[in-house]
From Swiss-Prot:
Biased composition annotated in UniProt, kind: Polar residues: 41-55
Name the record gives this protein: Uncharacterized protein YjbT
Gene: yjbT
Alphabetized UniProt keyword annotations: Signal
Top-rank taxon, per record: Bacteria
Family (UniProt): Belongs to the YjbT family.
InterPro entries registered for this protein in UniProt: YjbT
Region (Disordered), start-end ranges: 36-62
Leader sequence segment: 1-29
Length: 92
C-alpha cells in the first residue's frame, strides 16, 4: 500500500511539473522575429485586418542557370528462359 502511495505522489509531481512547463515557460520565450514594436502597426477594432507581407530584402532570387542532363536508364534485354523473371512489369 505504501509503495503505491509513493508512485502516486511521484506521478502527481511529474504531471504538476509538466503542466507548469507547458503553461508558464512559453511566457518567458523571446519574440520569434527581430521586428521592433515600432515596426508593427498598431491595430484597434476599427482597423482592417492585414496580411503579413515580406520586405524586399527578405526576397532572394533563385538562379535558374543550372545545367541539367538527361540520362537513359539501362534496361537489359529480357530473353524468356535465360534471364527472364516474370514480375508483371512488362505484361509478358
Amino acid at each position: 500500500m505504501k509503495r503505491n502511495l509513493i508512485k502516486v505522489v511521484k506521478m502527481k509531481s511529474y504531471f504538476a511539473a509538466l503542466m507548469l512547463s507547458v503553461s508558464v515557460l512559453p511566457a518567458y520565450a523571446g519574440p520569434l522575429g527581430t521586428a521592433d514594436k515600432a515596426d508593427l502597426p498598431q491595430s484597434n477594432v476599427s482597423s482592417p485586418m492585414m496580411a503579413q507581407s515580406l520586405r524586399q530584402p527578405d526576397l532572394q532570387p533563385i538562379s535558374t542557370d543550372r545545367k541539367t542532363e538527361c540520362f537513359r536508364l539501362y534496361t537489359p534485354d529480357r530473353k524468356p528462359g535465360v534471364n527472364y523473371v516474370p514480375d508483371g512489369s512488362t505484361g509478358h
